[in-house]
Amino acid sequence: MASTAAFLSTLAGSTSLGGATPASGGGSGRSKTARFLRRRRRGGAVRAAVSGTEQAPETTKKKGGGGGGGDERVVQVHSAEELDGALRAAKERLVVVEFAASHSVNSSRIYPCMVELSRTCGDVDFLLVMGDESDATRELCRREGITAVPHFTFYKGAEKVHEEEGIGPDQLAGDVLYYGDHHSAVVQLHSRADVESLISDHRGEGGKLVVLDVGLKRCGPCVKVYPTVVKLSRTMADTTVFARMNGDENDSCMEFLRDMDVVEVPTFLFIRDGDIVGRYVGSGRGELIGEILRYNGVKVT
C-alpha cells in the first residue's frame, strides 16, 4: 500500500511544481491568508478566524450508490449512536464522514474519490451517512447541522476539526492530507521544545535550511498550500528540512506563535543556523517556492 502522503500529494496537487511561477504583486494572483490573531497584551484572549474555507464498530458496508466493489473500507453508519461509537473507537486517527443523499448527483460523483482514498489511506477511517435513509439518519444530520450534501466532516479524538461541503476530489484529497498526514517527510512539531530540537539539529556546517510552516487546524489557505509543502519536502530533501506546527494545538504552540510575531497564517519561517533569516506569509505556490530557492542561495529572476 502506497503511503498516504505520496498518494494524496499527487492527487491534491493541481499545479505541478515545474509549472509554478512567482505571482506578481496584487491582482487576482495574490495568495490568501487567514487573519488569525492581533498583537495584544500577553494573557489576552486569542481569536482564531476560520478561513473561508482500533477498528470502527462493525456496521453495514455501503451498498450501491456508485460504490460497487472495492468500497469495503467506506463504512456506512445508520444512527447517531453508531457514529459516536465509531469516533470513540478511532481514538486519535482521522475520521472522514461523508453526509450524502440517495437523490444527490454530486454525492454520487464524489463517492469514487472517497473510495479511492479509503483504499490508499490505511490510517484514516472513512464513514458514510445517507441522510435520507431513515428518521435516525435525518435526526443525525440535524444534530450535525447538515443543510446540504455532499458534506464532509473531519474528526480527531472525537472532536470535529474541519468540515466542507460542495467540494471536488482535489480539495477532498488535500483536506485528508492536511489533517491526516503522518508519513511524509514534513516534521510534525507539537511544542516549542520540538522546534528548538529541530533547529539545534541543523546548526553549523552541513546544517540545512529549515522551513517551518505555521498554521491553524481550521484554515483554508493552510490546507490549500500543504500539498505543495509535502512535494517540496521530497524534492528538496538534500538541502531543506520542512516542518509544520498548528498554533491552536496547545498552549505551547500558541505561545511560540506570539513570540515569533505570527499574526496571519499560513506563515513560513526560514531558519538558517539557528537564526530566523526571513518569512513568507501566504499560500501562493510559486511565491513560496521562489522564497525557498532564494534562501537556499539560488538566484530567482
Swiss-Prot record:
In the database record, which residues form the transit peptide? 1-47
Q: Which UniProt keywords apply?
A: Chloroplast, Disulfide bond, Electron transport, Plastid, Redox-active center, Transit peptide, Transport
The name on file for this protein is Thioredoxin-like protein CDSP32, chloroplastic
Query: Basic residues bias: where?
Result: 32-44
Q: Where is this site: Contributes to redox potential value?
A: 220-221
Describe the location of the Thioredoxin domain by residue ranges.
50-285
Which GO CC terms are listed, alphabetically? chloroplast
Disulfide-bond pairs as recorded: 219-222
Q: What does this protein do?
A: Thiol-disulfide oxidoreductase that may participate in various redox reactions. May act as electron donor to the BAS1 peroxiredoxin. Possesses low insulin disulfide bonds reducing activity.
The compartments listed are:
Plastid, Chloroplast
